[in-house]
Amino acid sequence: MRVNIQLACTECKRRNYATDKNKKNTTGRLELKKYCPWDKKHTVHRETK
């Protein structure tokens, strides 16, 4: 079962990316290193509700 999620920057707290994940394979919160246009650098983005 795939669900849509939002990824928020850990530094500026803005929700920059939307993606989906498989809840059966990834039960915890997803963390990806993505580019933040407001910080102008790559930061860790975490899954939000």
UniProtKB/Swiss-Prot annotation:
SUPFAM superfamilies linked: Zn-binding ribosomal proteins
PROSITE patterns membership: RIBOSOMAL_L33
Protein's UniProt name: Large ribosomal subunit protein bL33
Keyword Ribonucleoprotein: yes
GO terms (BP aspect): translation
Pfam families the record matches: Ribosomal_L33
InterPro entries cross-referenced by the UniProt entry: Ribosomal_bL33, Ribosomal_bL33_CS, Ribosomal_bL33_sf, Ribosomal_zn-bd
Family statement: Belongs to the bacterial ribosomal protein bL33 family.
Gene3D superfamilies membership: Ribosomal protein L33 (2.20.28.120)
Gene for this chain: rpmG
GO cellular component: cytoplasm; ribonucleoprotein complex; ribosome
Origin: domain of life: Bacteria
Entry's Gene Ontology molecular function annotations: structural constituent of ribosome
Keyword list, A-Z: Ribonucleoprotein, Ribosomal protein
Transmembrane stretches, start-end: none
